[in-house]
C-alpha cells in the first residue's frame, strides 16, 4: 500500500471513529496508525500537502477528546513523536496545530486519572516539542501544566521526575512569562530547595535539568548570585564539564551545552570562565567528543565551541589548542593527539548532504572564527599545513556533484556553500593565507559555481521576482554575491579572474540577487551588495534601470506582504527550518493570483511566433525562446500553486466551519455559566446584606470597646506617673543607703586607727619603763664609781689597770646614750604624728569628743612625764659633766696626761 492510500485509509478510519466510537472502529484506527508509523512517512508530512495536513489536524482533534481510550492516545502520541523528530514538522505541530496546549490538557487529564503510561509519553513528547523552541505561554492548560509539574517534582521521586524536570527546563529557558509565573508561586522557596537538593543526585541528567532550571529562574536574582558566586562558580564549571564529558547520553550532553551557553551570555560568568584554571584541560576533553559518531552530540559540541568563540579570550585559547605545533613531517593520520580535533572537524565537514547537515555548517563557522583569531593574533604560520589540507575539502563543498537533488538537499548544499565561501573570505584577510587560496582556486570554479546557482536557484531575468518567497532563492543569491566578493579580492592574483568578474557583473541575471541584497534586512548582505554595485555601476552594459525596477518591485512586494500579514492563517515561523512550511500555506499577494495571460493563449502565440521565427534568421531568437519557455514554466508552476492554495482555502473553510460550531457550543455553555453566575451573584448579595447588619452591630461593639480602651488608657497614664515618682524615690533611697554604707566604712576605719594609736601608746609606756630601769642602773653605777673615786688615792695602781676597763665601759655607755637619743627623736616624731592624727580625728568625728578629750588628757600626762624625763636627763647630763670633771681631775692628779676638756661623759 502506497503512502497516499495509507493516509486516506487513516483519514477514513478517523472519520468513522468520530462518528461512532465503537470498539471495532477504535481497533481499526489503531491498526491504521500502526501501518502509518511503520512506513516512516516523515518526508510526506513535511511536504505540506493537503492530505497529510488533514490527517494531522484530525489526530490533534482526537487528542482533545477526553473520551478516547488510553491505548489510542498512546498510539497517536507515538506517531506524533516519530514525526516530531524532523525540525520542520515539529515547528508545524507547535505553531499551526497548537499541539503544546493539547498535550497539556492530556497531561492534566491523565494525572487526574492516574494513568502513568499516557502521562509519561505526553511529557516526553512535550519535552521533544519544546526543546530549544519558542513556547507560547498563553495557550490553554499551560498554567495547570506548570503547577502540576512543580508539584510532582516536589513530591516523592519516581520514574516521572526526570521527564518532568526536563520539560520544566525547556519551559523556563528564555521564557519570561513562565519564569514570572513560577516566581510568583507561594512555594517557590521550597521549590528552589528541592532543585538544589537534586544537584547531589546520582543521575547526571537530573543534575543538569535542576541546574538549568535554577539558572533560568535565579541567574539575575539574589539566589542566583549566591549559587553562581565567585566562590562557587568554579565548582559549578567543574560540575557542568563533568556532565558534558561523562554524561549519560546525547540528551544530557545537549542540556549541559545549552546550560553552559546560557551562562556564557552573562558577562560576569564569562569572565569567571576565562579565569577558570582547569579550562584548558576541560576544553581538550570537549574537543575529544568530536571524535564520536553521533551527529546530534557533535553538533551540540560545535555549538558550544562557537559560544566559546564569542568570548575573545576563550576563542584565543581554542585556536591555540587547535593549532598547537606538531613535529615536522607528520601527516594527518599520524598527528599527535593535540591535533585530533582538526581531523574530526574535517570529517564532519565532508559529511554527505543526507547526513549531519548541521555539523558541516557548524564546522565551517568554527573554522571561520578560529581563522579570524589566528589572523588577529598574527599567528598564521602555525596554520599553513592545516590550510593545505582544509582547502581541498572546502572546494569540494563548492561543487554540485550530485544530480537530481530535491529542494531540501539543494538548500542544505547552498547553506554549506555560503559558510565555505565565508571561510575563504576570512582566509583572504591575511596575505600568506590568501596565497594558499590563490594556489587552489581557479576562475573556472568560480564561474561554474555562479552558473550553477543561476540554474538551481531558479533566478530568471524578470524583475520583481518574489525572492522572499523562496528560501532557496535567498541562499542562491547569497552564494552568488559572496562568490563575487571573493573574486573581487582575488581578481589581481588569479589568472582570468578579473575578466570573468566584470563579465558576470554585466550579466542581467545578476539583477535579482543584487536587488535582494540591497533590499535585505541583513546588514552583511546589504554591505556585500553595495560593494558589488560599486564595482558594477561604472561598467557600460550594467542594467542599472532594470536593477532599480527590481528593487522597487521587491519593496512593493514587502509592503503588500506586511499589509496581508494579519490575514494570514498561520503563525510566523520561529526558526530557519520552518520558513518554507509557513510560506507554502500562506497565500501570495493579490496581483499574482490572476496572471495577465492564460497559458493556452501563451502557447498559441508562442507557436505562431515560432512559425514566424523560422523565417527570420536572427541570432537572438533562441534566447527569446528560452525566456518565453522559462516564463511559461513559471506560470505553470504558479497555476499549480494557486490550485494547491485553493484546496488549502477549502480545507481552511471546513476547519472554520468546525470552529464556528465549536464556538456556538462554547457560547451556549457560556450562557449557562452566566445564568449560574447570576444566581450566585444574587445569593452573594443576600449574604452581603446579612453581613452588613452584622457589621453594624460589630461597629457598635467596637465603639464601646474604644471608650473602654480610652478610660484604661487614662488610668494607665496615672499609673505611669506614680511609677515614675516611685522610681525617683527608689533612686534617692538607694543613694542614701550608699552614703550610709560609706559613712559606716569611714567609722570602722577610724576605729581601727584609734586601736592602732592605743597600741602605740602602750609601747611608749613600756619604753619609758625600760628607760627608767636603765636610768636606775646608771645611777647605781655612778654611785659605785663615786665610791671607787674615793678609793682612788689608796688604789692608784689598781685604778690604772681598771682605767682601761672604765674607758671601755664609758664608750659602751656613750653608745647606749646615742641609742637613747635616737629613740628620743623617734618618740618625738611619733608624738608629732600622733598629734596630727588626733587633730584630724577631732575634726572628723565630733561625736567621739568624749574619747578624744580622754585621749588629750592622756596625752597631757604623757607630755608631763616626758618633761619629767627630760628634766631627769638634764640632771643626769649635769651629773655626767661633774663625773667628767672628776675623772679629768683624777687624771690630772695622776699624770696630767688628760685634760679635763677632753673627757666627755655626756650621753
From Swiss-Prot:
Highly expressed in 17.5 and 18.5 dpc liver but not expressed in adult liver. Expressed at moderate level in embryonic brain, muscle and epidermal layers. It holds the Pfam family CIP2A_N. Residues 389-559 are annotated as: Required for homodimerization. It is found in: Cytoplasm; Chromosome. One of its GO terms (cellular component) is chromosome. One of its GO terms (biological process) is chromosome organization. Residues 161-247 are annotated as: Required for interaction with PPP2R5C. InterPro entries: ARM-like, ARM-type_fold, CIP2A, CIP2A_N. The modification Phosphoserine is found at residue 906. PANTHER family: PROTEIN CIP2A. Acts as an inhibitor of protein phosphatase PP2A. Promotes anchorage-independent cell growth and tumor formation by preventing dephosphorylation of MYC, thereby stabilizing MYC in human malignancies. Together with TOPBP1, plays an essential role in the response to genome instability generated by the presence of acentric chromosome fragments derived from shattered chromosomes within micronuclei. Homodimer. Interacts with MYC. Interacts with PPP2R5C; this interaction stabilizes CIP2A. Interacts with PPP2R1A; this interaction stabilizes CIP2A. Interacts with TOPBP1; forming the CIP2A-TOPBP1 complex. This is Protein CIP2A.
Amino acid at each position: 500500500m502506497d503512502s497516499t492510500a495509507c493516509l486516506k485509509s487513516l483519514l477514513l478510519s478517523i472519520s468513522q471513529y468520530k462518528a461512532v466510537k465503537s470498539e471495532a472502529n477504535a481497533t481499526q484506527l489503531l491498526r491504521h496508525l500502526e501501518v502509518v508509523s511503520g512506513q516512516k512517512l516523515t518526508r510526506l508530512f513535511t511536504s505540506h500537502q493537503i492530505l497529510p495536513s488533514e490527517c494531522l489536524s484530525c489526530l490533534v482533534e482526537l487528542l482533545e477528546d477526553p473520551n478516547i481510550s488510553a491505548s489510542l492516545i498512546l498510539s497517536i502520541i507515538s506517531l506524533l513523536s516519530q514525526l516530531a523528530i524532523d525540525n520542520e514538522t515539529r515547528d508545524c505541530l507547535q505553531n499551526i496545530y497548537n499541539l503544546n496546549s493539547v498535550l497539556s490538557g492530556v497531561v492534566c487529564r491523565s494525572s487526574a486519572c492516574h494513568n502513568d503510561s499516557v502521562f509519561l509519553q505526553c511529557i516526553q513528547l512535550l519535552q521533544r516539542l519544546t526543546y530549544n523552541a519558542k513556547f507560547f505561554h498563553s495557550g490553554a492548560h499551560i498554567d495547570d501544566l506548570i503547577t502540576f509539574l512543580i508539584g510532582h517534582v516536589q513530591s516523592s521521586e519516581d520514574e516521572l521526575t526526570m521527564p518532568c524536570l526536563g520539560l520544566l527546563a525547556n519551559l523556563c529557558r528564555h521564557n519570561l512569562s513562565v519564569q514570572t509565573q513560577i516566581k510568583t508561586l507561594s512555594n517557590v522557596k521550597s521549590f528552589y530547595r528541592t532543585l538544589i537538593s537534586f544537584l547531589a543526585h546520582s543521575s547526571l541528567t537530573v543534575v543538569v535539568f535542576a541546574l538549568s532550571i535554577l539558572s533560568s529562574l535565579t541567574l539575575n536574582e539574589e539566589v542566583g548570585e549566591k549559587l553562581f558566586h565567585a566562590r562557587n562558580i568554579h565548582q559549578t564549571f567543574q560540575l557542568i564539564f563533568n556532565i558534558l564529558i561523562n554524561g549519560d547520553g546525547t540528551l544530557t550532553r545537549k542540556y549541559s551545552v545549552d546550560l553552559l551557553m546560557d551562562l556564557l551570555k552573562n558577562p560576569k560568568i564569562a569572565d569567571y570562565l576565562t579565569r577558570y584554571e582547569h579550562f584548558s584541560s576541560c576544553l581538550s576533553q570537549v574537543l575529544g567528543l568530536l571524535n564520536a559518531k553521533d551527529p546530534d552530540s557533535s553538533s551540540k559540541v560545535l555549538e558550544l565551541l562557537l559560544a566559546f568563540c564569542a568570548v575573545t579570550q576563550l576563542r584565543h585559547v581554542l585556536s591555540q589548542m587547535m593549532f598547537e605545533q606538531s613535529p615536522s613531517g607528520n601527516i594527518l593520520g599520524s598527528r599527535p593527539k593535540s591535533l585530533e580535533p582538526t581531523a574530526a572537524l574535517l570529517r564532519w565537514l565532508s559529511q554527505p548532504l543526507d547526513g549531519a547537515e548541521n555539523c558541516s555548517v557548524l564546522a565551517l563557522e568554527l573554522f571561520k572564527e578560529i581563522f579570524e583569531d589566528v589572523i588577529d593574533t598574527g599567528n598564521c604560520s602555525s596554520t599553513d599545513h592545516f590550510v593545505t589540507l582544509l582547502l581541498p575539502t572546502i572546494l569540494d563543498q563548492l561543487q554540485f556533484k550530485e544530480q537530481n537533488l530535491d529542494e531540501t538537499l539543494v538548500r542544505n548544499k547552498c547553506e554549506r556553500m555560503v559558510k565555505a565561501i565565508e571561510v575563504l573570505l576570512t582566509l583572504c584577510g591575511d596575505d600568506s593565507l590568501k596565497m594558499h587560496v590563490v594556489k587552489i582556486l581557479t576562475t573556472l570554479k568560480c564561474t561554474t559555481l555562479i552558473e550553477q546557482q543561476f540554474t538551481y536557484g531558479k533566478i530568471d531575468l524578470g524583475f520583481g521576482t518574489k525572492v522572499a518567497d523562496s528560501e532557496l532563492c535567498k541562499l542562491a543569491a547569497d552564494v552568488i554575491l559572496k562568490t563575487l566578493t571573493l573574486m573581487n579580492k582575488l581578481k589581481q592574483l588569479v589568472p582570468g579572474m578579473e575578466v570573468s568578474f566584470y563579465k558576470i557583473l554585466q550579466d542581467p541575471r545578476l539583477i535579482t540577487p543584487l536587488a535582494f541584497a540591497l533590499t535585505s534586512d541583513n546588514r552583511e548582505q546589504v554591505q556585500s551588495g553595495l560593494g558589488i554595485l560599486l564595482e558594477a555601476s561604472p561598467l557600460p552594459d550594467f542594467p542599472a534601470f532594470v536593477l532599480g525596477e527590481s528593487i522597487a518591485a521587491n519593496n512593493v512586494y514587502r509592503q503588500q506582504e506586511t499589509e496581508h500579514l494579519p490575514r494570514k492563517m498561520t503563525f510566523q515561523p520561529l526558526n530557519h527550518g520552518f520558513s518554507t512550511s509557513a510560506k507554502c500555506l500562506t497565500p501570495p499577494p493579490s496581483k499574482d493570483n490572476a496572471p495577465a495571460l492564460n497559458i493556452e493563449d501563451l502557447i498559441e502565440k508562442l507557436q505562431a511566433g515560432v512559425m514566424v521565427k523560422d523565417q527570420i534568421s536572427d541570432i537572438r531568437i533562441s534566447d527569446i525562446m528560452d525566456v518565453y519557455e522559462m516564463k511559461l514554466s513559471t506560470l505553470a508552476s504558479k497555476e499549480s500553486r494557486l490550485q494547491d492554495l485553493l484546496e488549502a482555502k477549502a480545507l481552511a473553510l471546513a476547519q472554520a466551519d468546525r470552529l464556528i460550531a465549536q464556538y456556538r457550543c462554547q457560547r451556549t455553555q457560556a450562557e449557562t455559566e452566566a445564568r449560574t453566575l447570576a444566581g450566585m451573584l444574587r445569593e452573594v448579595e443576600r449574604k452581603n446584606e446579612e453581613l452588613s447588619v452584622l457589621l453594624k452591630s460589630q461597629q457598635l461593639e467596637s465603639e464601646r470597646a474604644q471608650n473602654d480602651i480610652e478610660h484604661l488608657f487614662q488610668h494607665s497614664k496615672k499609673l505611669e506617673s506614680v511609677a515614675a515618682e516611685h522610681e525617683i524615690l527608689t533612686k534617692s533611697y538607694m543613694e542614701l543607703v550608699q552614703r550610709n554604707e560609706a559613712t559606716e566604712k569611714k567609722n570602722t576605719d577610724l576605729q581601727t586607727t584609734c586601736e592602732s594609736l592605743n597600741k602605740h601608746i602602750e609601747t611608749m609606756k613600756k619604753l619609758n619603763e625600760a628607760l627608767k630601769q636603765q636610768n636606775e642602773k646608771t645611777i647605781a653605777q655612778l654611785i659605785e664609781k663615786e665610791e671607787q673615786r674615793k678609793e682612788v688615792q689608796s688604789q692608784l695602781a689598781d685604778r690604772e689597770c681598771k682605767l682601761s676597763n672604765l674607758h671601755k665601759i664609758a664608750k659602751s655607755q656613750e653608745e647606749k646614750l646615742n641609742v637613747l637619743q635616737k629613740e628620743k627623736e623617734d618618740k618625738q616624731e611619733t608624738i608629732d604624728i600622733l598629734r596630727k592624727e588626733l587633730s584630724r580625728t577631732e575634726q572628723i568625728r565630733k561625736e567621739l569628743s568624749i574619747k578624744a578629750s580622754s585621749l588629750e588628757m592622756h596625752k597631757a600626762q604623757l607630755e608631763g612625764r616626758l618633761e619629767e624625763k627630760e628634766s631627769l636627763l638634764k640632771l643626769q647630763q649635769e651629773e655626767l659633766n661633774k663625773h667628767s670633771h672628776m675623772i679629768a681631775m683624777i687624771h690630772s692628779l695622776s699624770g696630767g696626761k688628760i685634760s679635763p676638756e677632753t673627757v666627755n661623759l655626756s650621753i
